[in-house]
């Protein structure tokens, strides 16, 4: 739809009471109407919202009477004037051409909408009006036509970009592309075989030449066994009957295939062995799974007061060495009454970072009641990471089995990620 202002489609011009004192246009001059208001200062001087915005940006006063106006919210809304404006009659904007001459709308007397409605009815009318200009629904990029909505059927009958079915193969094709489709793509159009001169559909022709045409020259099927003959397909049976050495050619082919199968089997078996070995290596260099059993737990609980730890044996993941530190009576006074447990990376301080995902699982005689916590951490030096309050000491007796405490340890070193940049 062409751009327009409401004062361009009025049946009768408005008197000055409805106009802005600065731009002289109606204060309500565009849709949607609910976004516009008739606003005046306390002395009744009326401006449109756009002009009020510009005026208050320059000076906080009415440009006519100079009364102070700090913001739009201080202005008065003239609802009586708005109601009168909404009752004014206008022509439907779809009653005009979709272009202007000398910045003026041109009435379309033959094909345009003839409706005359109130300004208040305008928006609802436009939602249903069949005279609105639309773009081609087939291909608005290639088809530049614009037409009224009620003329869609007429346009579709002549549009070169409508999709139609090929009369031969029934495939959907854009009308403008139909000659190219018939020339190059249609599978039903009959084409002549260059060898036997019979006619076939394009799709059938390819199969005919590859597998059926009697005049196509082909290799002997025993070429792989040593037969170098090339004959027309129609003479193939005769060739195979007359040549008594084809059994020897077949034996050569069979033997060659047997050797290839044996070699393939050997390679597959080796790949399976190599794969299993690589799986083991990857597991060793990136992950450790095991358990740490602490015997005589009750004695340990007595002999290791708060802030003193038990230290597990070292275990390695690739070149990294780790150990677990366990505080039976808690790490420092804050965590007294709890068992604390930490994973330590044992290496000299380094600028590189080792990212580790790990878990500790305290085993219960009933596996469904085992206690497990997991965590991730970035290590740059020999500092522990873990759980200061892993379990309340009062509850730990439920996990003692034959005087032993067993902890499952699962530690995985996450490979570092890197960004590659080319300048």
From Swiss-Prot:
InterPro entries in the cross-refs: MATH/TRAF_dom, TRAF-like, Znf_RING/FYVE/PHD, Znf_TRAF
Zinc finger (RING-type): 20-66
PROSITE patterns named among the record's database cross-references: MATH (PS50144), ZF_TRAF (PS50145)
Organism: Dictyostelium discoideum (Social amoeba)
Keywords of the record: Cytoplasm, Metal-binding, Repeat, Zinc, Zinc-finger
Single Gene Ontology MF annotation: zinc ion binding
Domain MATH: 287-411
Zinc finger (TRAF-type): 124-179, 180-237
Protein known as: TNF receptor-associated factor family protein DDB_G0277243
A Pfam short name: MATH_2
Tree of life domain: Eukaryota
Family in the record: Belongs to the TNF receptor-associated factor family. A subfamily.
Its biological purpose: Probable adapter protein and signal transducer that links members of the tumor necrosis factor receptor family to different signaling pathways by association with the receptor cytoplasmic domain and kinases.
Disulfide bond keyword on record: no
GO cellular component assignments: cytoplasm
Annotated disulfide bonds: none
Subcellular location per the Swiss-Prot or TrEMBL entry: Cytoplasm
Free-text comment on this protein's domains from its UniProt entry: The MATH/TRAF domain binds to receptor cytoplasmic domains.
């Amino acid at each position: 739809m062409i751009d327009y202002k409401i004062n361009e489609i009025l049946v009768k011009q408005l008197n000055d009471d409805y106009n802005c004192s600065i731009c002289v246009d109606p204060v309500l001059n565009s849709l949607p109407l609910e976004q516009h208001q008739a606003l005046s200062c306390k002395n009744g001087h009326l401006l449109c919202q756009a002009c009020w915005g510009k005026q208050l940006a320059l000076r906080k006063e009415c440009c006519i009477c100079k009364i102070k106006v700090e913001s739009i919210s201080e202005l008065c809304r003239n609802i009586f004037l708005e109601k009168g404006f909404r009752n004014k009659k206008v022509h439907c904007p779809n009653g005009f051409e979709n272009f202007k001459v000398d910045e003026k709308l041109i009435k379309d007397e033959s094909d345009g909408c003839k409706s005359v409605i109130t300004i208040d009815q305008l928006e609802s009318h436009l939602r249903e009006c069949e005279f609105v200009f639309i773009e081609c629904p087939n291909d608005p990029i290639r088809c530049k036509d614009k037409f009224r909505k009620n003329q869609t059927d007429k346009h579709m009958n002549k549009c070169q970009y409508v999709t139609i079915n090929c009369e031969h193969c029934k495939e959907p094709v854009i009308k403008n592309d139909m000659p190219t489709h018939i020339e190059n793509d249609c599978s039903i159009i009959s084409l002549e075989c260059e060898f036997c001169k019979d006619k076939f559909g394009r799709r059938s022709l390819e199969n005919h030449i590859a597998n059926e045409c009697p005049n196509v020259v082909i290799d002997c099927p025993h070429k792989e066994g040593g037969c170098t003959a090339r004959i027309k397909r129609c003479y193939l049976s005769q060739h195979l009957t007359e040549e008594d050495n084809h059994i020897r050619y077949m034996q050569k082919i069979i033997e060659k295939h047997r050797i290839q199968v044996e070699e393939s089997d050997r390679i597959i078996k080796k790949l399976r062995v190599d794969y299993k070995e690589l799986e083991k290596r990857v597991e060793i260099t990136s992950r450790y799974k095991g358990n740490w059993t602490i015997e005589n737990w009750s004695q340990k609980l007595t002999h290791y007061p708060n802030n003193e730890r038990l230290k597990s044996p070292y275990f390695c993941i690739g070149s990294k060495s780790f150990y677990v530190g366990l505080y039976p009576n808690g790490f420092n006074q804050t965590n007294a009454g709890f068992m604390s447990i930490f994973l330590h990376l044992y290496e000299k301080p380094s600028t590189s970072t080792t990212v580790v995902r790990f878990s500790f699982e305290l085993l219960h005689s009933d596996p469904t009641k085992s206690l497990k916590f997991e965590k991730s951490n970035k290590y740059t030096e020999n500092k522990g990471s873990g759980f200061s309050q892993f379990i309340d000491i009062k509850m730990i007796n439920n996990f003692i089995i034959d005087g032993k405490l067993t902890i499952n340890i699962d530690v995985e070193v996450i490979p570092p990620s890197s960004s590659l940049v080319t300048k």
